């Protein structure tokens, strides 16, 4: 009885990840969801994506000949304040733990970019074309960066160590690999029910993590945080040994096709063709299904999609099907699918 609180809620039968051919942009679509769960999950995932994923960022910079951030450097067009702002935008991926050191040294004339930075083995610059400063003829600059890992946003004053040497300028650190997240809730249908939710998440990252992985990490964080509120153990229901021995196939094949919440046309076509159980259905080939009266390509695609969500497909061979006592077996294994 207790388990029905969560077991009978509808869950998405598919989650689509669309990358748009880019590592930094992704769209995630999940449907169907119970009414209201699109907003609940979308808002929770968005907040965790923006605040709680770990990443790497510059925490401090030391520039030769510069004592503080309100200085200017001869032959450098930008003042130090602008240089620090540009440094904050460097996107970094770091596999290990910090802090690590990076150095850039360049002579003018020319532009100093993130790609000019000399990195250590497990540190990668993800936006090498990003401009840090511009040098005039005869100008020279050397900068040493401190890189660390963390989460969220850390202001510069918290990156200032008490024993920091003179000239070490702390930098605001945006550790989060996720830059933007938006979500949209739309109505969708499942079978004959029209008021389920469809959740669409649009994610932009700095490239250190893909949108698909970012959503997975955020969901895992939520799962871990919510588990503390579960104050009971779920009873484990084991099938008797003699029942297990009777079956040479997945018990889900004993489920009746009229429980699949198919469209009326698809359900009627299956009934016309005397297809009662999923086990009957999956042994049919696509060609056989299309020969069924009033059964078209749209119905075929609908059935293929439902079967795929269960790990099944048309044209499967099932040994020992149908079993002689199929109705009794269907009742006995009803709780297992």
From Swiss-Prot:
It is an enzyme of class 2 (transferase). The keyword Signal does not apply. Residues 1-233 are annotated as: Alpha N-terminal domain (alpha-NTD). The N-terminal domain is essential for RNAP assembly and basal transcription, whereas the C-terminal domain is involved in interaction with transcriptional regulators and with upstream promoter elements. NCBIfam families: PRK05182.1-2, PRK05182.2-5, rpoA. Belongs to the RNA polymerase alpha chain family. This is DNA-directed RNA polymerase subunit alpha. It comes from Brucella canis (strain ATCC 23365 / NCTC 10854 / RM-666).
């Amino acid at each position: 009885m207790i388990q029905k609180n969560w077991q009978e809620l509808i869950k998405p039968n598919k989650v689509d990840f669309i990358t748009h051919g880019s590592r930094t942009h992704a769209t995630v679509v999940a449907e169907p969801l119970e009414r209201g769960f699109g907003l609940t999950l979308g808002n929770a995932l968005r907040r965790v994506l923006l605040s709680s994923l770990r990443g790497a960022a510059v925490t401090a910079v030391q520039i030769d000949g510069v004592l503080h951030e309100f200085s200017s450097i001869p032959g450098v067009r930008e003042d130090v304040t602008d240089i620090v702002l540009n440094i904050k935008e460097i996107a970094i991926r770091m596999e290990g733990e910090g802090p690590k050191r990076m150095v850039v040294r360049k002579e003018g004339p020319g532009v100093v970019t993130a790609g000019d930075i000399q990195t250590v083995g497990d540190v990668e610059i993800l936006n090498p074309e990003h401009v840090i400063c511009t040098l005039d003829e005869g100008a020279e600059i050397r900068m040493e960066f401190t890189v660390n890992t963390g989460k969220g946003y850390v202001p510069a004053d918290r990156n200032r160590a008490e024993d920091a040497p003179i000239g070490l300028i702390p930098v605001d650190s945006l550790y989060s690999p996720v830059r933007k997240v938006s979500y949209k809730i739309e109505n969708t249908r499942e079978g004959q029910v029209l008021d389920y939710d469809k959740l669409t998440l649009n994610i932009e990252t700095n490239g250190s993590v893909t949108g698909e992985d970012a959503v997975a990490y955020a969901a895992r964080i939520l799962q871990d945080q919510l588990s503390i509120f579960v104050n009971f153990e779920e009873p484990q229901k084991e099938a008797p040994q003699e029942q297990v021995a009777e079956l040479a196939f997945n018990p889900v094949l004993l489920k009746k096709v009229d429980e699949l919440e198919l469209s009326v046309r698809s359900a009627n076509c299956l009934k016309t063709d005397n297809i009662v159980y999923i086990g009957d259905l999956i042994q049919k080939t696509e060609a056989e299904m299309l020969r069924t009266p009033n059964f078209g390509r749209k119905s075929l695609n609908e059935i293929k999609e439902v079967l795929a969500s269960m790990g099944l497909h048309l044209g499967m061979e099932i040994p020992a099907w149908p079993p002689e006592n199929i109705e009794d077996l269907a009742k006995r294994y009803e709780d297992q699918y």
